């Protein structure tokens, strides 16, 4: 014998599976990582007790000021981010939701990711060294450059490595420092020809830079819009496309002459 359900009973029966589906959807892992401002490091100085840039085969200048490379800190590849976390991070300025594939393009295996990031870092350091020595016209002088930066992977410090090498070897070209005694931060890949490339997480990197005392931030020109959207007060954006352009901009800032590009 069939018993007809009352309207409230029918609604309750229908609501149960719908609620279960919603709960599953809300707490299901999503293909995202949550990132926040990471550490910065002065490439002209030491990081974790080791000199970041060591040069032999040529006189090295004593520098003032700082050139700070910047990073983001993302949830680990095996962390499962759900919808409430995504929504919470979406409305915060100190966090960003990024596709996991953009943060970890090599997959989810932690060891493989570390190897991939270290490979990218080594390639970036080699390119940065070649770019700097070529810019100075000293690529055939037997100058040896060693770059060390513990616990950091990826290619986004390339521009700052090149600038650090230039500052240590040549400064502004007339006896002064590229930084003008300032704390300058930035980000950007670089190739052997000195071309600067875009990176990810720029708004978070500007926050890290401001936190650690920077007043100037070098940004790949293609990412000006993203950098301006959430720019901390007191931080000046300087867009660059090449190593030569970055050096020229810093010299103009230091001397107070010439044109300093802006976003």
Language-model features, listed with the residues they occupy:
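Peripheral, non-AAA+ core regions of ATP-driven protein-machinery
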Residues: 2-263
């Amino acid at each position: 014998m069939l018993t007809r359900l009352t309207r409230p009973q029918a609604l309750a029966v229908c609501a149960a599976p719908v609620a279960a589906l919603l709960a599953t959807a809300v707490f299901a892992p999503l293909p995202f990582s949550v990132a926040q401002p990471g550490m910065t490091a002065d490439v002209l100085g030491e990081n974790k007790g080791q000199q970041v840039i060591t040069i032999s085969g040529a006189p090295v200048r004593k520098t003032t000021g700082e050139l700070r490379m910047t990073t983001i800190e993302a949830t680990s590849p095996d962390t499962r981010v759900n919808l409430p976390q995504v929504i919470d991070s979406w409305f915060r300025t100190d966090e960003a939701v990024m596709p996991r594939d953009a943060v970890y393009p090599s997959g989810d295996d932690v060891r493989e990711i570390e190897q991939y990031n270290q490979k990218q870092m080594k390639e970036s350091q080699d390119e940065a060294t070649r770019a700097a020595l070529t810019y100075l016209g000293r690529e055939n002088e037997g100058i040896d450059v060693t770059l060390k930066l513990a616990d950091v992977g990826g290619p986004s410090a390339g521009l700052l490595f090149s600038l650090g090498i230039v500052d240590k070897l040549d400064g502004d070209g007339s006896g002064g420092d590229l930084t003008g005694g300032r704390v300058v931060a930035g980000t950007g890949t670089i190739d052997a020809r000195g071309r600067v490339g875009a990176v990810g997480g720029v708004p978070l990197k500007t926050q890290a830079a401001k936190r650690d005392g920077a007043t100037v931030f070098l940004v790949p020109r293609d990412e000006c819009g993203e950098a301006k959207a959430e720019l901390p007060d007191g931080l000046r954006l300087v867009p660059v496309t090449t190593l030569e352009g970055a050096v020229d901009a810093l010299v103009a800032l230091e001397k107070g002459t010439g044109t300093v590009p802006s976003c």
